[in-house]
Amino acid sequence: MDVVEGKALQVSDAVYAYQLDGKGGMTAISVDAVASATQPCWLHLDYTYPESAEWLQNTPLLPEVVRDGLAGESMRPKITRLGDGTMITLRGINFNNDARPDQLVTIRVYMTDKLIVSTRHRKVYSIDNVLNDLQSGTGPTGSGHWLVDIADGLTDHTSEFIEDLHDKIIDLEDDLMEQKVPPRGQMALLRKQLIVLRRYMAPQRDVFSRLASERLPWMNDDDRRRMQEISERLGRGLEDLDGSIARTAVLSDEISSLMADAMNRRTYTMSLLAMVFLPTTFLTGLFGVNLGGIPGNTDAFGFTIFCMMLVVLVLSVAWWLKRSKWL
């Protein structure tokens, strides 16, 4: 890449615009700044902001094929090499307010040894973590180091979220052991979170693995080693996701079985009640026909005797059901 000057990186509504000092710190990008491999410039933009969107479409620092990708069209994690630059799309857990974690945030990055251009719409907290390290002087020293720190933060957040989902599954399993059915929709949401996370983290693991294996000029051996460790850590998380998805399938079957058993018990109880009261209903209906007068209507104790007959009949049927082991 040709010389990258600070005056070409002046974007008024940029989220962040810093130059790494090569020692773990940073300075604001000035008009007179000149980016180098040891002191790359980092421009972090929200592609929905007007000035940022205009800069992305018009700057000569970006290849034509990168512009749309940085402007929000790229969603699935992937890596594309373009000459001396690399286009990378990554996904992360959404920790923004009023949003579910499974509604993943996206960070898109175009990198060279001298320039880092990253874009997002929703806030990516891993970016803020790297920024805090830079402010304290313990941040990345170059482009490769910066990318590794971003990948490390994204993977840490993913691992934490997987652990949270794992704890929820354990709670559901404990509830089912106590015959407690979870609220409607809870299992469906849990399965969706697992499946969505699996869908995007699998290609992201492949991106990390490729970054670790390719000889990118702005990544040194230490960066590649750390990236390989991150890829392996995410791979273990994917194995946990696969196991969790299988466990939720078993839980769904168990919940269906539990609800079916409850319905069968209710149906069985209603059937027994019908059997108990069917003879009494028959007798009361028969006496209610009233053809030629109701039997016993002239007897002062007729109604009492009839009620006692019904009680004896109900008890007899109940005794028979008990003896037949139906009750």
From Swiss-Prot:
Cytoplasmic side: 1-271, 322-327
Statement: the UniProt record of this protein carries the keyword Ion transport: yes
Encoding gene, per UniProt annotation: zntB
Protein name, entry field: Zinc transport protein ZntB
Periplasmic side: 293-300
Signal peptide: none
Keywords associated with the record: Cell inner membrane, Cell membrane, Ion transport, Membrane, Transmembrane, Transmembrane helix, Transport, Zinc
Membrane protein topology class: Multi-pass membrane protein
Pfam families in the record: CorA
Gene Ontology CC: plasma membrane
Broad class of where this protein is predominantly found: membrane
Disulfide bonds: none
Species the sequence originates in: Yersinia pestis
Family the UniProt entry places it in: Belongs to the CorA metal ion transporter (MIT) (TC 1.A.35) family.
A Gene Ontology molecular function term of the record: magnesium ion transmembrane transporter activity
CDD domains membership: ZntB-like_1
HAMAP family per record: ZntB
Transmembrane segments: 272-292, 301-321
